[in-house]
C-alpha cells in the first residue's frame, strides 16, 4: 500500500510568503479607496481634568473640513475594549468604562474630539484650530502612590484606584516562616512601561451598506470587534460587519478595540460615507495600549539546602487610565509564583491600580515576562546567598514531572525543565564558562546566566475557549479552509493548512486557507491571543477534516462500489487500502459530484469544538554578556532559548517565533522604557528616535533549540509558542550581569544609567 506523506512536522514554505516578499499582500491601507474621508482624533494635553468647553468655530471654517465631533456629541453607551470572549454572566464581563470620546480626561493623550475631512492636510489643520478648555485635576503616575488615601481618584466606582485585588493562599505562610534555621531572602523588582512597536500602526476604515456598518480593521479579534462596536453604538451586533485583511503585527495591542467604534460612528455622521482613521507612531505609543509595568515584592524563607519553606509575593500592576484587559494580567503574573517552584506555604496579593498614564493592555507574554523577571532574578539571589550554583538550584527545585496545578488541572507530563536546561547548558558550554568566569578581575568582565519560564496555552478555565472551522471542496478537489482564529503575521495560516492536509490526506498545496477574515463569512472564532492559535484551532480543524473526509469517502463509495473501510485518501487520491491501487483523484471525484445529473452535491463540513483543556509550555534562556564596568555598559554576546512547545508543526516557523520573541525580550531587558514628565504627565519619548528599541547591532546571533514532547491534551501534539520566547530573556541577561559583576539589577531596563547607579551603590565604581 502507498505510504501516506506527512505534512505536519515539515518546514514547508509559508502560504503567504510570496505575496509578502513581492509586496502584493494587501493590508488595510492598501484596500482603502483613495476617495475616503480622513478622520483624526484630538488628544488631551493634560494628564487629568474635566473638559469645560470645546470651541470648533475656527476649525469648521477650514476648506475641506466635513464634520467635527466633540465629547459632548457622542452617544453615552459605555463599552469595554478588552479582546476577551463575552460572558453571559454580568459578574464576569469586562469593565465598561469607555466612551467614543471623553469629557473626563484621565491621561495625557485621552480622546476629546474628532475631525472628518476631505484630506490629511485639512484634518491636521483643523485639529490645531480646535480650542479646548479644561478644569485640571491632580494626577498620579506611580502605582503605589495611586493607592494612598489622598491620591486623586480616576474612577468613582473604584476607591483607592484599585481596579481589583486578588489574594492567593496555600498552606500557612505565617506559621511556616517561623521554622527555626530559615534564611530570609527579600527583594523588590520593577518592570517598565513598554509598547508593542509592531510595524503597522493601527488603522481602520468604515462605511455603511444597506443600513449596516462595515469596518475593515487591522485587528487580531474580528468577531470580538463586531460585538464591541455594537455595544459602543447601541445597535444589534448583527448590524456590524468586520473584515480583517493582512496585518503587520499586533503582539496584543490589536487584541483591544481601539478606534473601530469611533470610526464607524464618524461614518454614520457623514451619511455612511467611507471614513479612514489611522494613527501615527507617536499616537500609537500613547493612545493605543502598553505593557503593564509591575512592581513585585518577593519574600522567601528557605532552608540551608535551598528548599522553599514559605514564600510571599505582592504585585502592583499599573493599569493606566482605563480597565482594558485589566486585572487578568496581574492575576496571571501572581499565579506563576507558587507554580514555577512549587511551594506548600504561599501567600500572594496582586493589586491592579489605575494611574494617569496610557492604558495598559495585552502584550506578548501577558504578565509572565514581568513575573519571570521577578521570580528568576529572585531565584539567583537565593542561590547566591546560599552559595548554591544557580543551575544546580533550579535543577533541584523547578516544577517536577507529574506536577498538577490545583486550579487549571494542568499536568507537567514530562521532566521538561531539566531536558531544556540540559540542552541549553550543552549548547552554551555553561559549566565550563561559569568556572572560567569565576576567576575574572579587571574592568571588562564576562558573565553567563540563565532563567526558566512556564506559560499556559489559551485562557481555559478562566474564560471560554472555542474554535470553529469550515471546509469546502472546490471543483478541482482542493480544499478551502475557513477558521475563526486569525493570521496576524505569525504564520498561523500555514500551520492551519498543514494540519488540515495531514488529516485529510492531501498535499499541502491543495489546501487554501482564507486569510482575509469576514464576520459575515468566517465561522465564529475568538481571534489571535494567548498563544492559542495552533493549539485551539487544531481541535476544530481535525474534527472538521475528519467530517469532510468521511463525506468524501461516502461519495467515493457511491462512485466505486467499494466498501468504505477499504478506502482512504492518500496524496489527494482515493486509494483502495487492500492493494494500494488509486481509484480516482479528488479532482475527478469533486467534478463528478458537483456536475452529476443524477446525484449532484457540494462537499462541505463545518464544526465547532469547545476546548476545556490547557497545556503548559516550558523552557529556559541562557545568556552571555560582556560588562564594561567603568563604562556602565552590558553587551549581550550570546543567547539561546530552549523550548518545549510540544510537537513542532513547522520547525522553521517555530524558530522564527523564537527569534522574534528573543528580540523583544532583549529590548525589554536592556533598552525599552516609555518615560513620563513627573510635572505634567506628558510622555517624553513616544517616538522611535527617543524610545530605544534594540537594533541589529545590539543582537548577537539568536539561537533557538527545541525539546519535542508530544502534548497529550492537544489535537496535533502542539502547544503555546507565540509568547513564551520573550518570557525568560530579561532575567537571564540580568543573571549574567550578576555573574560577571556580583551586582544584580532589580529594575528594567538595565541601561547604562541604571548600571551606573547600581555599580556605584555596590562599590564597583
How should each PLM-predicted stretch be described?
Residues 10, 16-19, 89-92, 160-204, ...:
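Glycine-rich loop/linker segments at domain edges
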Residues 18-19, 128-141, 220, 227, ...:
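Extended active-site and interfacial segments that coordinate phosphate-rich ligands
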Residues 71-72, 234-239, 268-275, 304, ...:
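C-terminal catalytic domains of large/alpha subunits in multi-subunit enzymes
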Residues 103-104, 236-238, 243-244, 269-280, ...:
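Conserved catalytic cysteine-centered active-site region
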Residues 148-233, 398-478, 684-696, 703-705:
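Helix-loop-helix junctions that connect adjacent transmembrane helices in secondary transporters/permeases
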Residues 246, 250-277, 492-500:
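Thiamine diphosphate
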Amino acid at each position: 500500500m502507498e505510504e501516506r506523506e506527512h505534512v505536519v512536522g515539515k518546514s514547508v514554505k509559508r502560504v503567504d510568503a510570496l505575496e509578502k516578499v513581492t509586496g502584493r499582500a494587501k493590508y488595510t491601507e492598501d484596500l482603502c479607496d483613495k476617495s475616503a474621508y480622513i478622520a483624526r482624533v484630538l488628544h488631551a494635553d493634560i494628564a487629568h481634568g474635566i473638559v469645560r468647553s470645546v470651541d470648533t468655530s475656527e476649525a469648521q471654517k477650514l476648506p475641506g473640513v466635513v464634520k467635527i465631533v466633540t465629547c459632548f456629541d457622542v452617544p453615552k453607551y459605555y463599552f469595554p475594549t478588552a479582546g476577551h470572549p463575552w460572558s453571559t454572566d454580568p459578574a464576569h464581563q469586562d469593565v465598561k468604562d469607555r466612551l467614543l470620546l471623553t469629557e473626563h480626561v484621565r491621561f495625557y493623550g485621552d480622546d476629546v474630539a474628532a475631525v472628518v475631512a476631505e484630506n490629511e492636510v485639512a484634518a491636521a489643520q483643523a485639529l490645531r484650530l480646535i480650542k479646548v478648555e479644561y478644569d485640571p485635576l491632580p494626577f498620579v503616575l506611580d502605582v503605589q502612590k495611586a493607592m494612598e488615601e489622598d491620591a486623586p481618584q480616576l474612577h468613582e466606582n473604584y476607591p483607592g484606584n484599585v481596579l481589583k485585588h486578588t489574594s492567593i493562599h496555600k498552606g500557612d505562610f505565617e506559621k511556616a516562616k517561623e521554622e527555626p534555621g530559615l534564611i530570609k531572602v527579600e527583594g523588590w523588582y520593577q518592570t517598565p512601561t513598554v509598547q508593542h512597536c509592531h510595524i503597522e500602526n493601527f488603522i481602520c476604515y468604515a462605511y455603511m451598506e444597506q443600513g449596516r456598518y462595515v469596518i475593515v480593521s487591522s485587528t487580531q479579534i474580528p468577531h470580538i470587534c463586531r460585538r464591541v462596536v455594537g455595544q459602543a453604538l447601541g445597535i444589534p451586533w448583527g448590524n456590524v460587519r468586520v473584515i480583517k485583511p493582512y496585518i503587520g503585527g499586533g503582539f496584543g495591542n490589536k487584541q483591544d478595540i481601539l478606534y473601530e467604534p469611533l470610526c464607524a460612528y464618524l461614518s454614520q455622521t457623514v451619511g455612511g460615507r467611507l471614513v479612514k482613521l489611522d494613527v501615527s507612531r507617536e499616537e500609537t505609543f500613547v493612545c493605543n495600549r502598553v505593557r503593564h509595568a509591575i512592581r513585585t515584592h518577593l519574600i522567601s524563607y528557605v532552608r540551608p539546602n535551598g528548599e522553599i519553606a514559605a514564600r510571599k509575593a505582592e504585585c502592583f500592576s499599573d493599569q493606566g487610565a482605563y480597565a482594558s484587559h485589566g486585572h487578568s494580567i496581574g492575576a496571571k503574573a501572581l499565579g506563576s509564583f507558587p507554580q514555577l517552584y512549587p511551594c506548600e506555604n504561599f501567600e500572594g496579593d496582586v493589586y491592579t491600580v489605575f494611574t494617569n498614564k496610557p492604558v495598559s493592555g495585552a502584550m506578548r507574554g501577558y504578565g509572565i515576562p514581568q513575573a519571570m523577571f521577578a521570580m528568576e532574578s529572585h531565584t539567583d539571589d537565593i542561590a547566591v546567598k546560599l552559595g548554591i550554583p544557580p543551575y544546580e538550584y533550579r535543577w533541584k527545585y523547578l516544577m517536577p514531572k507529574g506536577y498538577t496545578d490545583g486550579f487549571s488541572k494542568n499536568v507537567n507530563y514530562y521532566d521538561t525543565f531539566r531536558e531544556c536546561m540540559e540542552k541549553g547548558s550543552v549548547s552554551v558550554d555553561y559549566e565550563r564558562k561559569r568556572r572560567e568566569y569565576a576567576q575574572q578581575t579587571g574592568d571588562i568582565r564576562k558573565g553567563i546566566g540563565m532563567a526558566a519560564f512556564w506559560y499556559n496555552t489559551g485562557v481555559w478555565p478562566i474564560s471560554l475557549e472555542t474554535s470553529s472551522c469550515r471546509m469546502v471542496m472546490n471543483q478541482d478537489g482542493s480544499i478551502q479552509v475557513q477558521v475563526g482564529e486569525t493570521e496576524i503575521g505569525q504564520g498561523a495560516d500555514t500551520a492551519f493548512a498543514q494540519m488540515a492536509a495531514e488529516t485529510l490526506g492531501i498535499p499541502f498545496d491543495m489546501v487554501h486557507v482564507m486569510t482575509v477574515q469576514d464576520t459575515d463569512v468566517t465561522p465564529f472564532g475568538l481571534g489571535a491571543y494567548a498563544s492559542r492559535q495552533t493549539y485551539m484551532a487544531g481541535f476544530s480543524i481535525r474534527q472538521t477534516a475528519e467530517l469532510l473526509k468521511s463525506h468524501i469517502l461516502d461519495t467515493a463509495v457511491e462512485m466505486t462500489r467499494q466498501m468504505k473501510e477499504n478506502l482512504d485518501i492518500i496524496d489527494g487520491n482515493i486509494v483502495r487500502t487492500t492493494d494500494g491501487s488509486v481509484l480516482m483523484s479528488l479532482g475527478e471525484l469533486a467534478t463528478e459530484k458537483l456536475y452529476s445529473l443524477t446525484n449532484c452535491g457540494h462537499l462541505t463540513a463545518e464544526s465547532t469544538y469547545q476546548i476545556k483543556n490547557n497545556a503548559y509550555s516550558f523552557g529556559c534562556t541562557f545568556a552571555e554578556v560582556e560588562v564594561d564596568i567603568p563604562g556602565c555598559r552590558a553587551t549581550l554576546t550570546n543567547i539561546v532559548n530552549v523550548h518545549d512547545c510540544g510537537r513542532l508543526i513547522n520547525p522553521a516557523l517555530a524558530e522564527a517565533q523564537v527569534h522574534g520573541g528573543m528580540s523583544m525580550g532583549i529590548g525589554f531587558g536592556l533598552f525599552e522604557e516609555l518615560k513620563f514628565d513627573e510635572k505634567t504627565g506628558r510622555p517624553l519619548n513616544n517616538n522611535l528616535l527617543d524610545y530605544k528599541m534594540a537594533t541589529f547591532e545590539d543582537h548577537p546571533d539568536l539561537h533557538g533549540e527545541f525539546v519535542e514532547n508530544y502534548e497529550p491534551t492537544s489535537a496535533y501534539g502542539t502547544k503555546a509558542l507565540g509568547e513564551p520566547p520573550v518570557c525568560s530573556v530579561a532575567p537571564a541577561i540580568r543573571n549574567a550581569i550578576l555573574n560577571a559583576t556580583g551586582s544584580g539589577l532589580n529594575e528594567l531596563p538595565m541601561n547604562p544609567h541604571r548600571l551606573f547607579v547600581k555599580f556605584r551603590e555596590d562599590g564597583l565604581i
